[in-house]
C-alpha cells in the first residue's frame, strides 16, 4: 500500500505553480515509484497486491485542491493501467479513497464528527484489498464505517 501525502490548499488562481508540482510529485510520482519498485518482484513471484491511495477530492473535486485532486485522480489512472499489465501475473491493483481524521486533515472536520472518521474504519477495506480474494481494478471509498465501490462509467452515447 502506498500512502504519502502533503497538502498545499489554495484556489487554483492563487496557487503558486511550485505548490501544484510539489503535491503532484509527492502523491502521483510517489505512488508510481512505490509500484515501480515492487512490480518486478511481484511479476517474478506471480503474485502481488498493490493498493493505491486516492481521494474523494480526486474522484469528485474539492474547492482549493486542484493540485491534490489532479494527483489523486492520476493515481486512479495509474491503477487502471497497472491492473491490465499485472493481471496475467496475478498482480491485482486497486485504489482506496479513505476519509479519516489524520494530522493532515484534523482541521477539516467538525469536532463532533471526528470520532466517526477514526482511521480504524479504513482497516477492513485495506485488509480486503490486500487479500488473496482481492478484486482487480476497483476503487473503494472507506470511512465512518462505510465501504462503497466507486465507478468511472461510460454511457452508450448519442449518435449524431
Identify the meaning behind each predicted range:
Residues 25, 58-61, 66-74:
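The catalytic Tyr-X3-Lys active-site helix of short-chain dehydrogenase/reductase
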Residues 95, 113-160:
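C-terminal helical subdomain
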Residues 55:
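Residue(s) in the substrate-gating loop at a strand-loop-helix junction
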Residues 42, 60, 76, 81-91, ...:
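Active-site-adjacent segment of SDR/Rossmann-fold oxidoreductases
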